[in-house]
Amino acid sequence: NEEEKVKWEPDVP
């Protein structure tokens, strides 16, 4: 599953 791959990490510092 790609659900584990997409940990929703924001590209903002």
UniProtKB/Swiss-Prot annotation:
The modification Proline amide is found at residue 13. Its main location: secreted. The keyword Secreted applies. Expressed by the skin glands. GO terms for cellular component: extracellular region. Signal peptide: none annotated. Keywords: Amidation, Amphibian defense peptide, Secreted. It is found in: Secreted. GO terms for biological process: defense response. This is Electrin-2.1. It comes from Litoria rubella (Desert tree frog).
